[in-house]
Structures are given as C-alpha cells and as structure tokens.
C-alpha cells in the first residue's frame, strides 16, 4: 500500500498523484492533513518507553500512524520554506518515531534505530522553491532510518499529468 500525506491546503496535488498512480496495481490512500489536528513531537520518548509504538500525544496523527504500519511507500506532499519542508511537512515526519524502536543497530555502516514493524520507502513531492539536492539527501536519510529506500524528490510542477516523464511514474509506482 502507498500512503500519500498531503500537507497542502489544496486537494489538487492529490488528484494529480492519484491519476499518475491509477495505472498501477498498488492500493493508494491519500490523507489530507492540512485540516487535521496534528501537534509537534515533543521528544518525550513515550512511544519507545511507556507505550511502545504509540505516541503519547492524543491527536489526529494516531489515524495516520496506524495506516503507516501497513504501508510500503510514503509520499509526502508539502510546501517548502527556506529550501526545506515547511512546518506542516516537518511536523508530520517528526511524528513517525513510533515506527522505530529505541534500540540501535548498524545498517550499512551507520547506526540506526531498529525497526518496530517493517521497512518504509519515502518520497517527497514539494511545492515552492525547494532545494532539490537538500530534499533528496533528506529523503534518502529518512528512508534509510526507516529501513527503506528513497522514492525520489519531485517538484509538484513536474507532475503535469498530461506529460509526466516515465521516470516519475516509475518512481511513484515502486
């Protein structure tokens, strides 16, 4: 299953993404987070210590994390500020900590948290003046932390459904 977290105020990007993924046999779930009540991670580590796999913050993110447990791919659709994710995108990704375990292991020569569930592939679709290189490196590191691989980073403007590149379609469907 592929989860698309759309943090933008508009649903239009979700419609574009849905049409790009329509010819794949993957189940796609698009979640619009802009109107959801999602708080910032407070770094309490309760998701590791007191309530393993569950965030201590009782808000709308609980629905999202339950669906991420069953997903193989995560696409984050976000605006950018100062070349990076805006606060909505960053907030949604910071809350993914319950997917990990507090114990550390070496993977590919790097120290990483053990996975609580399974690997999750991560991709970013951004709007605005994002720093492509920075976002690509961030996506790769997030995916590595989650045991998966980067699905790529694409500007929303490059997803014109009338002429999407084969590469974008292939990455989104993987």
Language model feature labels by segment:
Residues 1-5, 73-75, 118-125, 149-153:
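Hydrophobic beta-strand segments of well-ordered beta-sheets in folded domains
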Residues 1-78, 82-101, 161-174:
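N-terminal beta1-alpha1-beta2 submodule of the flavodoxin-like/Rossmannoid cofactor-binding fold
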Residues 5-10, 126-130, 155-158:
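Structural motif
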Residues 30-34, 103-108, 149-161:
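A generic structural motif
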Residues 102-149:
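Short, glycine-/small-residue-rich phosphate/pyrophosphate-handling segment
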Residues 131-174:
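Glycine-rich phosphate/pyrophosphate-binding loop and the adjoining helix
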